[in-house]
A protein has these predicted regions:
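A charged, aromatic-enriched C-terminal amphipathic alpha-helix characteristic of glycosyltransferases
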Residues: 185, 337, 351-380
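Acidic donor-binding loop of glycosyltransferase active sites
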Residues: 276-297, 312-313
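Nucleotide-activated donor-binding/catalytic signature segment of Leloir-type glycosyltransferases, i.e.
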Residues: 239, 246-277
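N-terminal strand-loop element at the rim of the active site
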Residues: 7-15, 27, 31-84, 96, ...
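A short helix/loop element that forms part of the nucleotide-sugar donor recognition site in Leloir-type
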Residues: 49-54, 181-195, 357-358
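Carbohydrate-associated surface elements
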Residues: 153, 174
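Conserved donor-binding/catalytic core segment of Leloir-type glycosyltransferases
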Residues: 4, 196-216, 222-225, 236, ...
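Conserved acidic donor-binding segment of nucleotide-sugar-dependent glycosyltransferases
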Residues: 301, 328-339, 348-353
């Protein structure tokens, strides 16, 4: 089957969603489908081939459509730049789809639905958050062949808006288990990353902020590391954006943490993440005590799955969306926004690691990218 993945943003990209898109497309290729990624031809910082950049072996075409890049046009007001870019991209998409046939259109961008639905080709929409509720968006969801929600809470809200439950499938992000085969030993990984051999290492891998300005729990992690300083716990924080790192470095110093207590690695390629996790004693997914939809409804379990795939003890903030897929037999939970409870959970994971190996193996098998995409495509009425 021919599947065309429509990206709203440049591809490849240094942002986390690009990794997710690459994994989705690679899985569909492994399932025997022919995949093409369509993206706007806008200037970005990543120049590498997508397969090399994301560390995937499967081959899929990438087509970049010429568009007006409002974000790079100095004379376009910032508030209008995205609008004009998407308007230009919508026209380019309609022209492309008129002359290039495909069986299914796949996207995670609701803003592109008018152009995709206009083509009369079957559309699968994957939602990573819900836009503002409008009658137009609900109507577009009803016209899609399948709507994929990352969490049950997202699905429930969408049904409440009037979308038929039979169109919706709940599928969190997946994990590529092959990336975690033949991991280096802890000592080998620490040597490669130049990490202290005599410290217990707590690692966080991921974005420091989300949706532009929302903190993801690094502040709480630094406070917990300050509490654990006397226990010899070394904090390793991997991720960007880089413009946030200096701010957190200042906060670390204010918390009494020096370079011998915490390292900010900055962004690393996805291909290096497994070896980074192998170097750690415990993997941490913190969160602030914010009543924001990202934490209450939309949080993806992708990073938790990767932590579990590494075989390391895992500490996670107890967030409602994550409770739908993991429980206390798999991770050590802590209260969001509570540095003392985070320090407690890290200590517990280091001294009394717990994980049900049977449940872990079953969860990871169920949530592999291949299994995930097979369920999505099989449940789509026209596929």
């Amino acid at each position: 089957m021919r599947i065309t993945y429509i990206s709203q943003a440049r591809f490849p990209t240094e942002k986390a969603h690009g990794h997710q898109i690459a994994q989705v497309c690679a899985a569909m290729v492994r399932l025997g489908h022919t995949v093409t990624v369509i993206a706007p031809d806008v200037r970005g910082t990543v120049r590498k081939d997508p397969r090399a950049y994301y560390g995937v072996r499967e081959s899929f075409d990438v087509v970049r459509l010429p568009v007006f890049d409002g974000l790079r046009s100095w004379w376009v007001p910032g508030s209008l730049a995205f609008f004009f870019t998407m308007r230009s991209y919508a026209r380019a998409l309609r022209s492309y789809l008129r002359v290039n046939s495909t069986d299914v259109l796949y996207t995670r961008s609701p803003v592109l639905l008018p152009s995709l639905l206009h083509s009369k080709i079957s559309v699968i929409l994957e939602l990573h958050t819900l836009p503002r509720r409008t009658s137009v968006f609900v109507r577009h969801c009803r016209q899609c062949q399948r709507v994929v929600c990352l969490t049950a809470l997202m699905r429930d809200e969408l049904i409440g808006w009037g979308v038929d439950s039979s169109k919706i499938i709940i599928e969190g992000d997946g994990v590529d288990l092959r990336r975690f085969e033949n991991l280096p030993s802890s000592s080998e990984a620490r040597t490669a990353w130049r990490l202290p051999a005599d410290r217990r290492i707590a690692v966080y891998v991921g974005s420091l902020i989300t949706r532009g300005t929302i903190e993801k729990g690094v502040r709480e992690l630094l406070a917990a590391l300050a509490l654990l300083k006397e226990r010899g716990v070394f904090g390793w924080i991997i991720g960007g954006p880089r413009d946030q790192i200096d701010r957190y470095r200042v906060l670390a110093v204010q918390s009494g943490l020096g370079d011998e207590d915490v390292r900010f690695e900055g962004p690393v390629s996805n291909t290096r993440v497994p070896s980074a996790l192998a170097a750690a004693d415990v993997c941490v997914y913190p969160a602030p005590a914010l009543q924001h939809s990202f934490f209450l409804r939309d949080t993806s379990p992708l990073k938790i799955f990767e932590y579990l795939a590494s075989g390391r003890p895992t500490v996670s903030a107890d967030l409602p969306p994550l409770r739908g897929v993991i429980d206390s037999s798999l991770v050590h939970f802590c209260q969001p926004g509570d540095a003392q409870d985070l320090a407690r959970a890290i200590t517990e994971a280091l001294e009394h690691p717990k994980v049900s190996q049977e449940k872990r193996a079953a969860l990871l098998a169920h949530t592999s990218w291949d299994a995930r995409m097979k369920r999505i495509l099989l449940l789509s009425p026209s596929v």
